[in-house]
Amino acid sequence: MTETTPFVRPDVALFLQFLNAAPGPKFWEVPAAEARAITSAMRDVADAPVGELAVIRDIDIPGPAGTIPARVYDRRADRGPGPVMVFYHGGGFVIGSLYSYEPYCAEVARLLDLPVISIDYRLSPEHPFPAPAEDCEAATRWIASSPAELGLNVTGLITSGDSAGGNLTIVTSMALRDKPAAVPILVQFPIYPVVTLDPDWPSMRAFSSGYLLTEEGMAYFGEGHAAVPGDYRSEPLNFPQEGMPPSLVTTASLDPLRDQGLAYVEKLKQAGVKVQHISADGNIHGHINIRQAIPSVQADVEGYINALKIMLAEVSPAA
């Protein structure tokens, strides 16, 4: 298939047909509070059930501007020392929540057989740049210290998140590279990340209308987040990546952000970082949240976690 007639999976095509014909306002046409409600409602109709898990509990993490809520997922009620995944949700720094990412985090906890801690960082526009990044760094450092309130003996970290959360994954990993936490980051796992404010990419032109993440949606997020150009937290692609942890980076072939994700993979390679790239061919941005509406996504998620397990075993055999 050419870029003008890209390959689209049949179940992705059906979902897009439904989404693009759906009545009512789009999230970028309403205030942030209403946009967040739309996101929560989408989980209820498009994502898989949370399913059974031994542990789903809420904790409070001290942050730079007050308490940061978080949620712990674990398939085991009793967990010995080991790594944990710290997860930063997507949503353009404006939408998304613990609730909207609960099915995905629970599934990862089951597949990975490690605790997953989802961070409910402050959202823009109420808390613009760099508040989300500040919260994520603070929360990750706190988790790394194995505080009694966490109830886990943390030996290493996996930083992960999707879209805006992919950005937060990378910039948190950069911050901990430059000023290490109590335990190391074993692997960073950004999922279709945003790594630059530069909109001039072929995939941005090809897929910015009709493929879930739209030009209007990206403008809405950009205005709300008010990121400062030239800061490593807004444009990590433009900053050195030497010394970063082993990295698993995923992109989607129908994603406006695809090409900047690929550029980040190349940046890591040039910096001598161990990196693996997985492309979800025929799939769209945001797919980890729509496993029920797009059944083929389950295989994508399982493939990501299998690759992550292999990478973890290589960098930390005791993990």
PLM segments and residue spans:
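Catalytic active-site module of serine/aspartate enzymes centered on a nucleophile-bearing elbow/loop
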Residues: 294-319
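Short beta-strand element of the alpha/beta-hydrolase
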Residues: 81-91
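A glycine/proline-hinged amphipathic helix-loop "lid/cap" segment
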Residues: 1-72, 312-319
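Gly/Ser-rich "nucleophile elbow"/oxyanion-hole loop immediately N-terminal to the catalytic nucleophile
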Residues: 144-159, 179
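Short beta-strand/loop motif that positions the catalytic acidic residue
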Residues: 249-251
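Short amphipathic alpha-helix adjacent to the substrate-entry channel of hydrolases
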Residues: 99-118
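Hydrolase active-site cap/lid region
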Residues: 174, 178-229, 243
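Alpha/beta-hydrolase active-site loop
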Residues: 127-147, 304
